[in-house]
């Protein structure tokens, strides 16, 4: 191709590249604009309700002052139970997929089912637990039922993370440990888990960040409670459900609490996400 013919082609490619880059930047700015708008609205309305009463008083009746102490407690209990239930099962299932089911048909089936569960709407999981547990206990809503529905959200995230992280561990580490006569289970626990710990912990934190804002499954399981309750087999308040109730009410005091709860929840999710990224970054730096 002569220089005269190559020049227009080069110019056209440059123009296409500049246009594509410009469109990408505009799209990114468009998304950041609305994200900033949402965060600004959340901060401007939520800060008005941030005070000591928010964390020390219970949800109030209409047109009275109060806080979200019982809702914060309920969310902490249900999220903690969900992590406690979903994490061990997810780690064990992910370990089986990575170490034993990698080249088996059963492993392919489990991965397929896990992917379906990973993308399932949370309200479907809530209805499943409602049918499986709540209806079988005489329609008794409870924090435990809410934790079960959240555990079904945690489970596929931890399974996928554990599977991926263990498969990233170099096979030479497995072979070196096995060549020393170490049993397979010790290789998994003492070698593989240590190498993949940062990634697995990151997955658990991301699962926690996801379930902390879930509302739909709790509407069918934990329901809610206006009072302080520490019995996990009774209805219990949670921040997302209270926000859903208060935000749609005509009472200004409830709306202020809903905005404040949304701000606290957003900050919590942000801190958890930053912690997860910090763990991954520190692990990457230590390996480099």
How does the language model describe each region?
Residues 132, 136, 143-144, 150, ...:
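Non-cytoplasmic
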Residues 83, 161-162, 182-220:
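Transmembrane alpha-helices
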Residues 89, 102-107, 111, 170, ...:
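Amphipathic cytosolic juxtamembrane alpha-helices at the membrane-cytosol interface
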Residues 20, 97, 101, 163-167, ...:
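C-terminal transmembrane helix and the adjacent membrane-cytosol boundary/short C-terminal tail
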Residues 3-26, 40-84, 103, 245-256:
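Periplasmic/extracellular loop-to-transmembrane helix junction in inner-membrane transport proteins
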């Amino acid at each position: 191709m002569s220089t005269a013919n190559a020049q227009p082609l080069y110019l056209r490619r440059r123009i296409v590249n500049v246009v594509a880059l410009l469109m990408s930047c505009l799209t990114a700015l468009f998304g950041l604009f609305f994200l900033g708008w949402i965060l600004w609205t959340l901060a401007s309305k939520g800060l008005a309700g941030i005070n000591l009463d928010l964390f020390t008083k219970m949800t109030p009746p209409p047109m009275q002052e109060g806080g979200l102490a019982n809702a914060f407690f309920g969310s902490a209990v249900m999220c903690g139970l969900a992590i406690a239930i979903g994490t061990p099962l997810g780690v064990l299932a992910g370990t089986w997929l990575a170490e034993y089911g990698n080249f088996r048909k059963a492993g392919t089936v489990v991965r397929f089912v896990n992917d379906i569960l990973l993308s399932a709407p949370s309200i479907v999981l809530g209805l499943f637990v409602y049918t499986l547990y709540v209806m079988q206990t005489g329609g008794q809503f409870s924090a435990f039922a809410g934790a079960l529905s959240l555990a079904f959200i945690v489970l596929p995230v931890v399974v996928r993370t554990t599977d991926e992280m263990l498969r990233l561990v170099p096979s030479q580490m497995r072979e070196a440990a096995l060549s020393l006569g170490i049993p397979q289970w010790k290789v998994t626990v003492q070698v593989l888990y240590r190498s993949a710990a940062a990634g697995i912990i990151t997955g658990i934190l991301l699962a926690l960040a996801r379930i902390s804002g879930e509302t739909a499954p709790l509407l069918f399981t934990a329901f809610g409670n206006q009072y302080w309750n520490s019995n996990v087999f009774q209805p219990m308040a949670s921040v997302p459900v209270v926000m859903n109730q208060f935000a749609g009410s005509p009472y200004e005091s409830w709306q202020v609490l809903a905005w404040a709860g949304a701000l606290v929840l957003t900050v919590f999710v942000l801190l958890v996400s930053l912690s997860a990224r910090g763990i991954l970054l520190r692990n990457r730096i230590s390996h480099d």
